[in-house]
Amino acid sequence: MVWLPRVPCVAAVILLLTVLSPPVALVRNSRPRFLEYSTSECHFYNGTQRVRFLERYIYNREEYVRFDSDVGEYRAVTELGRPDAEYWNSQPEILEDARATVDTYCRHNYEIFDNFLVPRRVEPTVTVYPTKTQPLEHHNLLVCSVSDFYPGNIEVRWFRNGKEEKTGIVSTGLVRNGDWTFQTLVMLETVPQSGEVYTCQVEHPSLTDPVTVEWKAQSTSAQNKMLSGVGGFVLGLLFLGAGLFIYFRNQKGQSGLQPTGLLS
């Protein structure tokens, strides 16, 4: 088995040379290809009070051996990893280096990124909407969209008429945006009744108080009346704007006329 060092630049060079080797570089090579790689993970609990280091070795998408700092030695996950685990555990220098990684790798990097990542806070944007525009008293799915927030620990709860809903809730889980922010959708399956008020409440470290967004269940006639009122208001604003435009244009035209007099 090939052992990849934890030093990023060295590991990158080894992988690059592997990719560029002649057997793999052939475009029409029909031979089976095999992939081996390792991952190094640092898990922090309450800052650096408790740190766990995991080093996993994967061959063809299957983990075969790992080092767990909570265990203190290499353990085979499958029979394929047993020879490696036995060999590495028999080498004092390798084992000592792996055990020290909690401090030399995890805590060291935590201190470097502490000033940027730990205090960073981005407030979420919260919107609520139904998935279907259909009459009341029919099955519907209310969506609470929470986007562009950091860090990822967030709590989203649904309320109906002030009472928390515990059932019928579906979540997408955290989705990474790729720009150090997250998003999630928390949906409530329900049959809205006229007059009911649904509230999505979001709690996040960036917020001093929870954010709440309401959605009111309205009948079709009530929605039509509201839309008619909004449409009439907008139409009135358009007529008012047109009237003011014509008025000021006429005023400007009159002020531009010069008085006529007799020529001597």
UniProtKB/Swiss-Prot annotation:
Membrane spanning residue stretches: 226-248
Lineage top rank: taxon: Eukaryota
Family under the similarity heading: Belongs to the MHC class II family.
Major place of residence: membrane
PANTHER family per the UniProt record, alphabetical: HLA CLASS II HISTOCOMPATIBILITY ANTIGEN, DRB1 BETA CHAIN, MHC CLASS II-RELATED
Gene that encodes it: H2-Eb1
Coiled coil regions, renumbered to chain: none
Post-translational events: Ubiquitinated in immature dendritic cells leading to down-regulation of MHC class II.
A Pfam family annotated for this UniProt entry: MHC_II_beta
Carbohydrate attachment residues: N46
Region (Beta-2): 122-215
Leader peptide range in chain numbering: 1-31
Keywords: Adaptive immunity, Disulfide bond, Glycoprotein, Immunity, Membrane, MHC II, Signal, Transmembrane, Transmembrane helix, Ubl conjugation
Name of the protein in its database record: H-2 class II histocompatibility antigen, I-E beta chain
Residue ranges that the UniProt entry lists as topological domain Extracellular: 32-225
Domain Ig-like C1-type: 124-214
Compartment(s) where it occurs, according to its Swiss-Prot or TrEMBL record: Membrane
Annotated GO CC locations: MHC class II protein complex
Organism in which the protein naturally occurs: Mus musculus (Mouse)
Disulfide bonds, paired cysteine numbers: C42-C106, C144-C200
